[in-house]
A protein has these predicted regions:
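Generic C-terminal helix-cap and adjacent flexible tail
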Residues: 3-4, 20, 407-408
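Bacterial N-terminal signal peptides
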Residues: 9-20
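Bacterial N-terminal signal peptides that target proteins for export
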Residues: 1-10
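Noncatalytic, solvent-exposed loop/strand surfaces
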Residues: 23-408
């Protein structure tokens, strides 16, 4: 009996510690919870040159965010001169480039002047690293080992847009899921992580552009995958792609990612084009919930590209033009707004603070609340359009030419 009790105690301790260990990884776009938040409480608030642990050169160009697993950082880049798209691996400890592997070589796609050819953030489960690029009119997805060996590469579908490609994949159990909104076909595709074969596919009939990453969270008592695409906001079962609910509108296209407010139980999404509107939806419904579960709508503060963030019941968003807004998440009431500088990067949060970076690499640290409260400021010293990552008390920022590691 004592032996059994001891084993149960050890198991309980392991299960207690495991979430904390997992939280140290930043495995995909916007981190472990997909919303830009970190449980890390040991991060620097204000910093200068003395807080830069290392600064490593990044070859080529790209706007993808770094992802982190254990002692490794993964990043994508493109070499326009040779038309190569590349996966990079750095050592988290000192920023040393451990390896780089070409993913594909293909003609450069059409894109917006502010977009790049390596804008999709990788995803990793600690066994493989998954990347996606546009090659010609094909969406190519590849999986590499942690040591940089190609495991598989598949065509997931086609893509056509004047703005270029930038959809980031997310992981759910043994599936890699990608939202592709394209003029040549709009769809959500789930691939098996082991071999890249298709697990399921959701076709979207309107063929509208979408760049929003799927958001997976337990809401209203069940796991839901919220996808903003094709003139609507929809929730699916990520296991099999079955539709749970949908809310039509408020616009045709979406770029920023959904977020969730635990306090009010609302999932909040902003449309991008032709109208920027926040929708806050109660995710407990089924079928068409357009007229029954949309709790509030708000035009002011709705972002085009940067994803918003929720901290302690406050919704912070920043427009591409550079106006930072704070809304009450449960009601959509705008509490304040403040000029912050034009930006594409999405904010992150930790320890009750929000870290927001504009395109100049200027970082403002804010305590969300009913009035604007700036806690600190910092600067990278170079242009930066990528969203940062957080792991083990350190920030990882991608600038135009370098990857920065910042600590206390």
């Amino acid at each position: 009996m004592n032996h059994i009790a001891f084993r149960l105690a050890c198991l309980s301790l392991f299960l207690f510690i495991l979430p904390g260990l997992m939280a140290q990884n930043w495995p995909s776009w916007r981190g472990p919870d997909g919303d830009g938040s970190s449980a890390d409480a040991n991060l620097p608030i204000a910093w200068g040159a003395e807080n830069v642990v290392w600064k490593s050169a990044v070859p080529g160009e790209g706007f993808s965010s770094p992802v982190i697993w254990a002692d490794r950082i993964f990043l994508t880049t493109a070499l326009p001169a040779t038309q190569e798209r590349i996966l990079l691996c750095y050592a988290r400890k000192d920023g040393k480039l451990l390896w780089q592997q070409p993913v594909l070589t293909a003609p450069l796609e059409r894109k917006h002047p502010d977009n790049g050819y390596a804008s999709s953030t990788p995803a990793t489960d600690g066994k493989r690293v998954y990347v996606t690029f546009q090659g010609g009119e094909d969406v190519m997805v590849a999986a590499f080992s942690m040591e940089g060996n190609l495991i598989w590469k598949v065509k997931a579908g086609t893509f056509s847009s004047p703005h270029g490609f930038c959809s980031s994949p997310v992981l759910f159990k043994d599936k890699l899921i990608l939202n592709v909104g394209s003029q040549s076909g709009a769809y959500v595709v789930a691939l098996r992580c082991s071999n890249g074969s298709q697990a399921y596919r959701i076709e979207n009939a309107q063929n509208q552009l979408a760049y929003s990453t799927p958001f997976i969270r337990t809401m209203a008592g069940k796991i839901q995958m919220v996808v903003a695409a094709d003139k609507r906001i929809s929730a699916y079962n990520p296991e099999d792609g079955a539709l749970l609910w949908r809310a039509d509108g408020p616009a045709d296209e979406y770029a920023s990612s959904p977020v969730y407010d635990d306090a009010s139980g609302l999932v909040i999404v902003s449309s991008s084009y032709p109208r920027r509107v926040f929708y806050a939806i109660n995710p407990s419904g089924s079928g068409d919930v357009t007229n029954t579960h949309v709790v509030w709508k708000q035009v002011q503060g709705a972002p085009y590209t940067p994803s918003p963030i929720v901290v302690n019941g406050y919704l912070l968003s920043v427009t591409t033009q550079g106006v930072l807004h704070c809304l009450e998440a449960k009601s959509g009431t705008v509490l304040w707004s403040r000029e912050s500088g034009a930006q594409y990067a999405s904010p992150v949060s930790a320890n009750g603070l929000v870290y927001n970076m504009n395109d100049k690499g200027e970082i403002t640290v804010i305590k969300p609340g009913p009035v604007f409260e700036q806690v600190a400021s910092a600067a990278l010293g170079e242009k930066a359009l990528a969203s940062p990552a957080i792991s083990e008390g350190r920030f990882y920022y991608r600038g135009a030419s370098h990857l920065f590691c910042i600590s206390k």
